[in-house]
């Protein structure tokens, strides 16, 4: 950690098609081996499919899906006197988005559909309907935090 000054967070350029920073971040998370144009085409075709299914605009449908996957609390390990406790802590807004996007991409990669665009579209539509692997992951994290509520006073 630097001692001199706090280093500001880099500004992310909004994506070219919709002008959304959130979507640009999602493309970056999906990107493999620096192939951004490939990642963008996958995301855009997935969003088109999603918009046709839901009847909403591409960005609106994406926002709904992301909102249903965002976690509000998570557990962090805290060592107290020789034993480790899973302490529930609130998730910061930036991390909420990052976790939600990461979980959606992971869930889409594990699906068995034909193309990645189709997998992503299916996972996003499942997330919009509050079902699917990414939503299940959020529920598991929330359940874990609820189960360890007794250790909330160890927060730092």
Swiss-Prot record:
GO cellular component, alphabetical, reads: small ribosomal subunit
Which Gene Ontology molecular function entries are recorded, alphabetically? Answer: rRNA binding; structural constituent of ribosome; tRNA binding
Q: Which Pfam families match?
A: Ribosomal_S7 (PF00177)
Keywords from UniProt, A to Z, are: Ribonucleoprotein, Ribosomal protein, RNA-binding, rRNA-binding
Task: Output the InterPro entries linked to this UniProt entry.
Answer: Ribosomal_uS7 (IPR000235), Ribosomal_uS7_bac/org-type (IPR005717), Ribosomal_uS7_CS (IPR020606), Ribosomal_uS7_dom (IPR023798), Ribosomal_uS7_dom_sf (IPR036823)
Check the record and name the SUPFAM superfamilies matching this protein: Ribosomal protein S7
Q: How does it assemble?
A: Part of the 30S ribosomal subunit. Contacts proteins S9 and S11.
GO:BP terms for this protein? Answer: translation
Q: What function does the entry list? A: One of the primary rRNA binding proteins, it binds directly to 16S rRNA where it nucleates assembly of the head domain of the 30S subunit. Is located at the subunit interface close to the decoding center, probably blocks exit of the E-site tRNA.
Q: Per the similarity annotation, which family is this? A: Belongs to the universal ribosomal protein uS7 family.
Q: State the protein's name.
A: Small ribosomal subunit protein uS7
